[in-house]
């Protein structure tokens, strides 16, 4: 059975690209036509490429490897968090902090600090500290949780990145390229496909489209993890 159907893609509006004046000519081969000043993505190609990315994600997960979900634009935040949690992976959905990959050592120190503050909140340390100090520490903890909560369980570099909107997440992509980490991404008509290892041509602005494609990739991970368990 196909991992995604043409009907699902159409219903979620995956075929709607950007306005024709905002396009990247490198995406020409994935465009079916132009309608009312908007590019329409060729969903036959999308179906095939979703299948390819699904198999890549499944393969990575079956090896017990880690995939980091990244989508910080408003339309992607909820789907990125929900689907990463559903398939037991990590995510960044607020802001990509420069060096999250290339300077992971420093990021790790901030994650350790978050764990320390959480422990202090749990073990009663906050109750014996001056009120002013507790307010300050809670504020620090909330800020760290906001930006690092999705990766606080990540002890080492991810083996791959799944990205919504490579234009928005260009720093994440640059860092992944520097470290040779493969990138799987939804790529709209205004993006550069050359930066991506495994792409899904599709609408990265509609909440339903982002949710459908992100959920499909999460399904691939869940399936891959089951393969890993049966092999064990």
From Swiss-Prot:
The keyword Ribonucleoprotein applies. Keywords: Ribonucleoprotein, Ribosomal protein. This is Small ribosomal subunit protein uS2. GO terms for molecular function: structural constituent of ribosome. GO terms for biological process: translation. It comes from the Bacteria. The gene is rpsB. Pfam families: Ribosomal_S2. HAMAP family: Ribosomal_uS2_B. GO terms for cellular component: cytosolic small ribosomal subunit. The keyword Oxidoreductase does not apply. Belongs to the universal ribosomal protein uS2 family.
């Amino acid at each position: 059975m196909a991992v995604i159907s043409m009907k699902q893609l159409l219903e979620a509006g995956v075929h709607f690209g950007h306005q024709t004046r905002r396009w990247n000519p490198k995406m020409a081969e994935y465009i079916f036509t132009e309608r009312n000043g908007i590019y329409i993505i060729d969903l036959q190609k999308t179906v095939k490429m979703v299948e390819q990315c699904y198999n890549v994600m499944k393969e990575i997960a079956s090896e017990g490897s880690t995939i980091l979900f990244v989508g910080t634009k408003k339309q992607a935040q909820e789907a990125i968090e929900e689907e990463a949690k559903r398939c037991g992976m990590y995510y960044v959905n607020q802001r990509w902090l420069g060096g999250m990959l290339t300077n992971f050592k420093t990021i790790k120190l901030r994650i350790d600090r978050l764990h320390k503050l959480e422990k202090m909140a749990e073990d009663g340390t906050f109750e014996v500290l001056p009120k002013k100090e507790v307010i300050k520490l809670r504020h620090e903890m909330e800020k760290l949780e906001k930006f690092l909560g999705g990766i606080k369980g990540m002890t080492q570099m991810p083996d791959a990145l799944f990205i919504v909107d490579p234009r928005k997440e260009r720093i994440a992509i640059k860092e992944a390229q520097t470290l040779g980490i493969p990138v799987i991404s939804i790529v709209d008509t205004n993006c550069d496909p050359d930066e991506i290892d495994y792409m899904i041509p599709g609408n990265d602005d509609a909440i339903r489209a982002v949710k459908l494609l992100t959920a499909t990739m999460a399904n691939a991970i869940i399936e891959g993890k089951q393969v890993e368990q049966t092999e064990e």
